[in-house]
């Protein structure tokens, strides 16, 4: 059995297979998954698992060099914005419109659907390198 933080098999496979520059989307329950992008659905019920819990878990496993967040998040969901700022630390964050975030999502290797049912709880993580 795995001993590290990330236990979900499908998500572990995706993270382990990501290369430098690959994109991973973590989204709320309502974020659409573009055609051709692998969906990893973690949602059990509204709020479970929470978006920030999933982000924190993935950040423990994935080297991230940059992130993309919708600019609407700061205004419409300040708690998520504050949580992302805390979790991402010094990772550079680009803000785009929610529509642009959905367009960029089409280039992701996977989209992780959480049980989060608050607006604009979405982030795109760009994989970095550990050396």
Curated annotation (Swiss-Prot):
Its main location: cytoplasm. Substrate binds at residues 28, 98, 120-122. The active site is at residue 20. One of its GO terms (cellular component) is cytosol. It is found in: Cytoplasm. Keywords: Carbohydrate metabolism, Cytoplasm, Isomerase. Signal peptide: none annotated. GO terms for molecular function: D-ribose pyranase activity; intramolecular lyase activity; monosaccharide binding. It catalyses: beta-D-ribopyranose = beta-D-ribofuranose. It comes from the Bacteria. Its EC number is 5.4.99.62. Disulfide bonds: none annotated. Belongs to the RbsD / FucU family. RbsD subfamily. NCBIfam families: PRK11797.1. Catalyzes the interconversion of beta-pyran and beta-furan forms of D-ribose. Homodecamer. This is D-ribose pyranase. The gene is rbsD.
